[in-house]
UniProtKB/Swiss-Prot annotation:
One of its GO terms (molecular function) is DNA binding. Pfam families: RNA_pol_Rpb2_1, RNA_pol_Rpb2_2, RNA_pol_Rpb2_3, RNA_pol_Rpb2_45, RNA_pol_Rpb2_6, RNA_pol_Rpb2_7. Keywords: DNA-directed RNA polymerase, Nucleotidyltransferase, Transcription, Transferase. This is DNA-directed RNA polymerase subunit beta. CDD domains: RNA_pol_B_RPB2. It comes from Mycoplasma mycoides subsp. mycoides SC (strain CCUG 32753 / NCTC 10114 / PG1). It comes from the Bacteria. The gene is rpoB. One of its GO terms (biological process) is DNA-templated transcription.
Length: 1291
């Protein structure tokens, strides 16, 4: 038996055809969000605060220290934040201590009286200084006096210590120390929900992780085409700060070719690398000693003007470098040296980050450069004991032992350079042979010691980089591939927020220093020293405007999960899609098990937006790791799972997971297809170091949801993975018969299901709540019911447990949308036949049975939110009211007494949802008007109807209404609203959309199509046993697309349906051909799954057998109701006066260049003329045409289109005069309006002519032509031929 029965949960069992035993369980799929935010809260904020505190004043007399900090309770719950359109956040408070230390001369005379008691003098002086009488003397110890100053009873008193240094005749010289402490508000910080999202202004947002180039040292080489010499490059790239770029050069001096080494500091002009070392205070002799007189450095030193006097040489080099960095400015040698040191060695200006230091140590330490090299000297410890003998070859077997010896920092030398440069002053130095075979010439390797941990660059780093670069020509070390995932790291949510927090604190730091310098520190309070606004502003800007803060894709649970696991190379500090080449978008060998090679967008972002693979994790340095099992002597160690980065797996041979093995994990094959350094490798069993944990570890969650993925072409698999995210939740979700086994984990971690937080017993269940009793006591889970998602789909949760059930932690107890019994269910299992049908499935179109529509198989619900704000205007308050002037009772039929639509009402386009009137500008009323107003009330009031109406396509049933009133003295229970808003009313209208012609559907294999015909059940073909076919697909859609997975799926689906079983067939390790044949035979299927179909219309069988089976089909969120659109009267573009385009603008259809050619080709001159004039931008013509149609007159001759007028004005704007000449030779100005034949009196009041003044040049002749035309400001442009009310609305 090739399968086992697997229990998914208490309700679902499946036949599991998984081949690889001991499958590692999936990690928390949204851990990349939740775990890193938790790190930010506990450690990330602390790290930033440690960088800035204590804050010293400019003169050093006062210091602000941080004692502790913490989050307070959130002001709103997640549910409240969503309902009230607020931010789900919590305030951060810090306890700060301000210490001030000053020397003061205190006069003994007060109010003309000289005091001689020190305590009296000090008390009087303090009262004057602090302008306070609340000073209490506490104690005296010799010449030290201690006081307390109470500012507020609720706050801690200030402590003041005064030490008398000298008692003069008229004054006391004292040292005054003041200690103030208090709690300070640092701002509100958005919190992450349990689902890994942020609630910003009521909407769920996701911070997408960013894939960027890691800080570190990078090496490259290229051939100089002129000289034929190889040029070597090295870059040291920090996260923030100055770049150092090294390059070798080939020059000719006389007949000698020399290869000096140059460096560019922050993209400045290049200077020799040795001059930089000299500027650090390393002498010429030391440079040559460190590098054993390397010929490149000897030649480079010859380029420097060195006279042999260390001080003069140092001064010259420092000033020369300063001049190049600052583009010609000069400075003293001390000033220049200070400047160079500050841009390279100051932690505040130069930040390598932990990841950068990790990469530098990995790249520049000697142990990582000597594999397959022969050591040319004895390696000894401090006592000259030989640890590694000369002529030892370093290979795969002894590298670990040698690395451990080198980690003890043996063979290190001390560096001698300027004392004010910080950092490790040691490097490791070992000689190896340039050629391991000949063993003649040696070269020295300079590398970092294990004690290098600084997060800024050090002189040791620079020397090691130079050494690495010099040794590349002997093939010691390797050049870097920038697209390798070992050189790209992920900035997760936690790090991105930490960077924003750092920027905010940087601004606060500057403000605090200024305040300490300018304030009277005797009177200042700690609570007022810090203003949190800069921090709050930066955080708000990041969440609202950053490219990485995205409105969550919430069509279904899978799209939500994918959004949280997304990696983007775009955004600030990343790439831009215009400049990104093909290489960076391509699939790289290091993506294996880390980034999905399939799932990526199809448009301009292809390859720049990726998804994490199923088992991938991000380590503490931001590098993506993937798990492997250790293999020792051909035996798989199932209990030893190691997560490796792309760099770590480089020198290991890794086998695929589907090898043949016995029950003890012994590999049975002798030769195994493996990977080594990114290439395929046929390895012997004893060579294997690691083995994959699962065949699906290379793909993402969405991709691993495709059964028979291995039988699909990659292009179609990409479409399949992307379209699963677009499937709308259906009202009767159905889990797939043919699943891949990831459906449970995807549903559990999506954030839409309700998951048990602990082991417990279910005590109570209904449609709104589940109550459990566990270790922590009674716990209540609230279920959402018809909530609107970000994408307008409905979020409804339904319980799948009953009272008395024992639930385990992590078990799904209530399904979310698109879930069935705790499994992801984004579509329906339908009977599919691959056959043509009267041409109705031409070009991927789909023929469907009416039975599916009647049974509501693909019916979905969609919720629209309509918001009305009641404002306080300058003319008076707006009112929500039923009695709206000039509105019929028929129009108000759905409104209650308050003027708000009743819940449950079915509303159509144009119906009033909320009645609202806005006062117009009130004039001073006469006594008669006041009397009329008193008698007739609303009727005579000067108000405008501003009611909320159902827009086009918005019809449905009113599902709920939410009212939020502003907080005030009269309404203390209200919510915080902007100043001029009195009330917000939200009306939710739900639509039930059945599937119809024009809707887009797809399978999971990229087989997408539009429904072209829905046939009555009796006309659909059926099987011989009477089973009707639900969907007919075109068989021509399969061969060229090469997505054969869909054919295997229908056969397996049909067999499983007949056996009344559900199956699991995971990607790359599911059913094989033999097993498929077995299950089909078990189900009694013959002839390779092909059957005789009967034509429903004639009752005759089709000529040939047809492939019929069960396929999982999805209804996508591209529905015809959202797309179809027609324009009657609508807006025009301001300048060209042509109709706008697109449904959102109520635009027309574009009649473009090629369509004009088509009419020209037909010779349809009259049609062409009216399309280009009166139907488009002939302003006068279209108004006259409208008038002619309304009054049944003859349609007038077209005039000049406005676009021609625009062209002529643009040409005039260039300084060319343009005019028309008639047959008599008379010149006339080009005018869009024919003034002679145009009489404005013929126009009705509502036909307003508009002419913009933006395009006219200042020319008297032109002005004269237009002098009696009315000009209107751009903002007041009114459309012609609209009713008075419409014009009023649009104004």
């Amino acid at each position: 038996m090739a399968y086992k029965i697997r229990k998914i949960n208490r309700n679902v069992e499946r036949r599991d055809y998984t081949k690889v035993s001991m499958n590692l369980s999936l990690p928390n799929l949204i851990g990349i969000q939740t775990e890193t935010f938790e790190w930010f809260k506990t450690k990330g904020i602390q790290e930033v605060l440690d960088e800035f505190f204590p804050i010293l004043s400019f003169d050093g007399s006062s210091v602000l220290t941080l004692e502790n900090w913490g989050f307070k309770e959130p002001r709103l719950s997640v549910r409240q934040a969503k309902e009230e359109s607020k931010i789900y956040d919590a305030p951060i408070y810090a306890n700060l201590k301000l210490s001030v230390n000053k020397t003061e001369e205190i006069q003994k005379e007060f109010d003309g009286v000289v005091l001689d008691d020190a305590l009296q003098i000090l008390s009087k002086w303090l009262e004057e200084k602090t302008v306070s009488k609340n000073i209490t003397f506490k104690q005296q110890s010799q010449n030290s006096y201690f006081f307390e100053l109470t500012i507020k009873k609720s706050e801690k008193p200030d402590l003041i210590q005064i030490d008398i240094i000298e008692d003069k005749k008229t004054s006391l010289i004292c040292n005054v120390s003041i200690y103030k402490s208090g709690e300070v508000f640092l701002g509100d910080f958005p919190l992450m929900t349990e689902a890994g999202t942020f609630i910003i202004n009521g909407s769920q947002k996701v911070i997408v992780s960013q894939l960027v180039r890691s800080p570190g040292a990078y090496f490259n080489k290229e051939l100089n085409r002129k000289t034929g010499e190889m040029i070597y490059f090295a870059d040291i790239i920090p996260s923030r700060g100055t770049w150092l770029e090294y390059e070798t050069d080939s020059k000719k001096i006389g007949n000698d070719a020399i290869n000096p080494l140059y460096v560019k500091i922050d993209k400045s002009r290049k200077t020799t690398a040795t001059s930089l070392l000299l500027a650090f205070g390393i002498s010429k002799d030391d440079i040559l000693n460190i590098f054993d007189n390397d010929e490149v450095l000897v030649e480079t030193l010859q380029q420097d003007s060195i006279i042999g006097d260390f001080k003069i040489d140092w001064s010259n080099q420092v000033q020369e470098i300063y001049k190049k960095i600052t583009q010609g400015e000069t400075a003293t040698s001390e000033g220049a040296s200070k400047f160079i040191n500050s841009i390279l060695f100051d932690k505040r200006k130069y930040d390598l980050t932990k990841a950068g230091r990790f990469k530098l140590k990995q790249k520049l330490s000697i142990k990582n450069r000597i594999l397959n090299r022969v050591i040319a000297e004895d390696i000894v410890d401090a006592n000259n004991n030989v640890l590694i003998a000369k002529d030892t070859e370093v290979n795969k077997h002894n590298i670990k032992q040698i690395s451990e010896i080198l980690d003890q920092d043996v063979m290190s030398i001390d560096l001698n350079y300027l004392s004010d440069i910080p950092g490790t002053r040691k490097v490791q130095k070992i000689k190896v042979y340039k050629d391991s075979e000949l063993k003649t010439d040696t070269t020295c390797l300079i590398g970092l010691t294990s004690s290098s941990n600084e997060e800024f660059i050090t002189v040791a780093d620079i020397l090691s980089t130079v050494s690495y670069l010099l040794n590349l020509k002997y093939n010691i070390g390797e050049i870097d591939d920038i697209d390798n995932l070992g050189n790209r790291r992920v900035r997760t949510v936690g790090e991105l927020l930490q960077n924003q927090f750092r920027m905010g604190l940087n601004r606060i730091d500057k403000n605090v220093k200024e305040k300490l310098a300018t304030s009277d520190l005797y009177k200042v309070k700690t609570s007022t020293i810090i203003n949190a606004k800069p921090l709050t502003a930066i955080i708000g800007e990041f969440f609202n405007l950053s490219q990485l803060s995205q409105f969550m894709d919430q069509i279904n649970p899978l799209s939500e999960l994918t959004n949280k696991r997304r990696l983007t190379a775009l955004g600030s500090g990343g790439l831009s899609r215009d400049r990104a080449g093909l290489e960076v978008r391509d699939v790289h060998p290091s993506h294996y098990g880390r980034i999905c090679p399939i799932e990526t967008p199809e448009g301009p972002n292809i390859g720049l937006i990726n998804n994490l693979s199923t088992y991938a994790r991000v380590n503490e340095y931001g590098f993506i790791t993937t798990p492997y099992r250790k293999v020792i002597n051909g035996i798989i160690q199932n209990d030893q799972v190691e997560y490796l980065t792309a760099d770590q797996e480089k020198n290991f041979i890794i086998a695929q997971s589907n090898v043949n093995q016995d029950e003890n994990g012994k590999i049975l094959d002798e030769i195994i297809v493996s990977r080594f350094n990114g290439d395929d490798y046929m390895a012997k069993v004893e060579e294997i170091d690691y083995i994959d944990v699962s065949p699906k570890q290379i793909v993402s969650v969405a991709t691993s949801g495709i059964p028979f993925l291995e039988n699909d072409d990659a292009n179609r698999a990409l479409m399949g993975a992307n379209m699963q995210r677009q499937a709308v939740p259906l009202i009767k979700p159905e889990s797939p018969i043919v699943a891949t086994g990831i459906e449970f984990e995807a549903a559990r971690d999506s954030g839409e299901a309700i998951v048990a937080k602990e082991d417990a017993i279910v005590k109570y269940v209904d449609s709104k709540t589940i109550i459990t009793d566990g270790e922590s006591g009674i716990r209540t889970y609230i279920l959402s019911d018809y909530e609107r998602s970000n994408n307008g789909t409905s979020l409804t949760q339904s319980p799948i447990v009953k009272v008395g059930d024992v639930v385990k932690k992590g078990e799904i107890i209530a399904d979310g949308p698109s879930m069935d019994q705790g499994e992801l269910a984004i579509g329906q299992n339908v009977v599919v036949a691959f056959s043509t049908y009267n041409g109705y499935n031409f070009e991927d179109a789909i023929v469907m049975s009416e039975r599916i529509v009647i049974d509501d198989r693909f019916t979905s619900t969609h919720i629209d939110e309509y918001t009305l704000e009641v404002r306080n205007t300058k003319q008076g308050q707006e009112e929500v009211i039923r009695e709206i002037p000039n509105m019929s009772e028929q129009a108000k039929r759905h409104l209650d007494a308050e003027g708000i639509v009743a819940i449950g009402t079915e509303v159509k386009v144009g119906d009033v949802l909320v009645g609202k009137v806005t006062p117009k500008g009130q004039v001073q009323l006469s006594p008669e008007d006041k009397l009329l107003h008193a008698i007739f009330g609303e009727k005579s009031r000067n108000v405008k109807d501003n009611s909320l109406r159902v827009p086009n396509g918005g019809e449905g049933i009113v599902q709920s209404i939410k009212r939020f009133k502003a907080k005030s003295a009269l309404n203390p229970d209200g919510i915080e609203l902007p100043a001029d808003i009195i009330e917000v009313i939200k009306v939710y209208v739900v639509q039930k959309r059945k599937i119809q012609e024009g809707d887009k559907m797809s399978g999971r294999h990229g087989n997408k199509g539009i429904i072209s015909r829905i046939l009555p059940v009796e006309d659909m073909p059926h099987l011989e046993d009477g089973t009707p076919v639900d969907i007919i697909l075109n068989p021509q859609g399969v061969p060229s697309r090469m997505n054969i997975g869909q054919i295997l799926e229908i056969h397996l689906g049909m067999a499983a349906k007949k056996l009344n079983q559900k199956v699991i067939t995971p990607a790359f390790e599911g059913l094989n051909e033999k097993e498929l044949e077995e299950i089909m035979a078990e189900a009694g299927m013959t002839n390779y799954g092909k059957v005789t179909l009967i034509d429903g219309q004639t009752g005759e069988p089709f000529d040939k057998p047809i492939a019929v089976g069960v396929m999982y089909m999805l209804k996508l969120s591209h529905m015809v109701d959202d797309k179809i659109h027609a324009r009657n009267v609508g807006p025009y573009s301001l300048i060209t006066q042509q109709p706008l385009g697109g449904k959102a603008q109520n635009g027309g259809q574009r009649f473009g260049e090629m369509e004009v050619w088509a009419l020209e080709a037909y010779g349809a001159a009259h049609t062409l003329r009216e399309i280009l004039t009166i139907k488009s931008d002939d302003i006068k013509g279209r108004s006259k045409t409208y008038e002619a149609i309304v009054r049944s007159k003859k349609i007038p001759e077209p005039g000049i289109p406005e676009s021609f007028n625009v062209l002529s004005k643009e040409i005039m704007g260039l300084g060319f005069n343009m005019y028309m000449i008639d047959e008599t030779g008379e010149k006339s100005v080009i005018n869009a309006y024919d003034k002679k034949n145009f009489d404005a009196d013929n126009y009705e009041d509502d036909e307003i002519l508009v002419k913009t003044d933006t395009l006219y040049i200042d020319d008297e002749d032109v002005d004269a032509e237009f002098e009696d035309l009315t000009y209107v400001d751009e903002n007041d442009i009114l459309r012609s031929f609209e009713s008075e009310n419409d014009i009023d609305e649009e104004e």
